[in-house]
Amino acid sequence: MNRKACVVTGASRGMGRGIALVLAKEAGCRVYATARDKEALNTLAKEVSQSDSDGQIVPCELDQNDDQAVRNFVQSFQTKENRIDLLVNSAYAGLVAIAPHCGKPFWERPISVFDASLMIGLRSSYVMSSLFAPMMVKQKSGLMIQVSSFGGVQYLFDVGYGVGKAGLDRLSADMAAELKPHGVYAITLHPGAAVTEVTAFPDGETPIFSGRAVTALLNKANKDHLEKLNGKVVQAAELAVDYDFVDIDGKMPTGVEITKTWRDAMSSPLIQYSFEADLPDPSKSLNHPDVSAFFPGAKNYKV
């Protein structure tokens, strides 16, 4: 069977796990799932292999802090596959680092909290994309997706979070400009507030919802829609409306009003570019001590 070949980073938990699971289990793809936690990846692979799906998870233990290890992974992939259809950059260490410091200004946080949002998140996405780009350029096709957040548009948790997410949004935009002549797309996905192994936002989206959003872009979006979204940010909830999918409970977790509010915000000049824009008030943001309750699982993981 000619399965589509995909790579999903950060696939041991959270959005990455949900995306890898849906691609393999619901879409029948062969997914090279990367993370540091090999045991969690093996559990994911077993879940797919024991289902009635034709898809496959290939567990790939990988520390994306190690550039040479990433190069070795890409080279190994290329010896096994003659093409890559999809790269999803989902690995992110920031929330685990941020959780113990909710409510603090940036100067009271360790520098390592800032680094966590940029190293495994922004930088790791750039490195992985740069190493897979030649393969996509050569085959004149492929899709790169960065998993980001509305925190790239509006102040949420802290300075590092915003800088990292804004960087991911811009990463897709600038990569798309250079990849466009070669038939390769780069798009940023914004999930809504989520319920994962780390986070527990009320009525939040599950990682399966993001998985279905990614699958829609891979298997359902036509060339016109991909060109419209190329280099842009799209919300998972917007894709759910376009391609008629729901979360695992049969619901649309992020409502139409919230989705529209976020889209309006994304369509307006960012505060740094508008002299008329008011600065955000951190006391009314998610940078508050009580917000740590939304990260109950953070204590179970290391950055």
Describe the residue ranges of each PLM region:
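A short, exposed helix-loop element centered on a Lys and neighboring polar residues
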Residues: 129-130, 173
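Rossmann-fold cofactor-recognition segment
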Residues: 48-67
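C-terminal helical subdomain
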Residues: 188-189, 200-302
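Catalytic loop of short-chain dehydrogenase/reductase
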Residues: 93-94, 105-113, 117, 143-173, ...
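Conserved glycine-rich Rossmann-like NAD(P)H-binding loop of the short-chain dehydrogenase/reductase
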Residues: 26-43
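Conserved glycine-rich cofactor-binding loop
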Residues: 12-14
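Conserved NAD(P)H cofactor-binding loop of Rossmann-fold oxidoreductase domains
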Residues: 90-102
